[in-house]
């Protein structure tokens, strides 16, 4: 998920705008899971009850399901959810995909062992970022882990989502969370996007209470 659609300088703000992006192929929809999540799954880090927040067309969610997890994927865009359901059916994978708002995850009414975030954190402005963290707190069980991939400040230019610093990540999760790692990573984009693979942060953050 990115903050700006292809060829646009205006941030996406509404559910309708997010949905409109999926009339085509958005630049973050590569048709495969991001490599950092593949490595995490292979290392046994995606197990139990898993939520893929801002799941798009479901690649991270289906990766988790293929590794035996019980998976829910939520996205604000109905077209993305429709595509995700079709892909999961084609691949013979059981994933529950629902239209939902990342700022209101409490509406799911359940908690998860693992929450995956591929490009959601970085779409929020300063006002909505604390709301998103509070929303996450409602669904990550105590001791559970939230894994996120976001653009870093090392990515040049201003195309796409806002850049995030390590200090911003640590500050956002200072209360009620334990930052276990923040590592440089790569965020892959689809062919033809204005940027190639971009510099990113990959973080693992545990819910401490």
Name the predicted role of every residue range.
Residues 119-123:
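Short catalytic micro-motifs in class I SAM-dependent methyltransferases
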Residues 2-51, 57-108, 124-139, 144-209:
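Class I (Rossmann-like) S-adenosyl-L-methionine-dependent methyltransferase catalytic domain
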Residues 107-115:
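A short acidic, Gly/Pro-enriched loop at the edge of an enzyme's catalytic core
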């Amino acid at each position: 998920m990115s903050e700006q659609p292809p060829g646009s300088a205006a941030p996406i703000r509404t559910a309708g705008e997010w949905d409109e992006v999926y009339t085509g192929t958005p630049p973050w929809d590569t048709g495969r899971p991001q490599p950092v999540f593949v490595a995490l799954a292979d290392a046994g880090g995606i197990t139990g009850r898993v939520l893929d927040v801002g799941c798009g067309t479901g690649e991270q969610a289906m990766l988790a399901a293929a590794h035996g997890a019980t998976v829910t994927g939520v996205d604000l865009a109905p077209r993305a959810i429709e595509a995700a359901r079709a892909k999961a059916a084609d691949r013979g994978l059981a994933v529950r995909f629902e239209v939902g708002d990342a700022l209101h995850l409490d509406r799911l009414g359940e908690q998860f062992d693992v929450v995956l975030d591929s490009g959601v954190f970085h779409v929020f402005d300063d006002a909505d970022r604390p709301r998103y963290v509070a929303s996450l707190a409602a669904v990550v069980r105590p001791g559970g882990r939230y894994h996120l991939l976001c653009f870093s400040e090392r990515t040049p230019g201003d195309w796409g989502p806002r850049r995030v610093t390590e200090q911003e990540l640590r500050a956002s999760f200072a209360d009620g969370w334990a930052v276990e790692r923040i590592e440089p990573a790569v965020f892959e984009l689809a062919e033809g996007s204005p940027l190639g693979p971009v510099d990113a942060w990959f973080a693992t953050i545990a819910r401490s209470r």
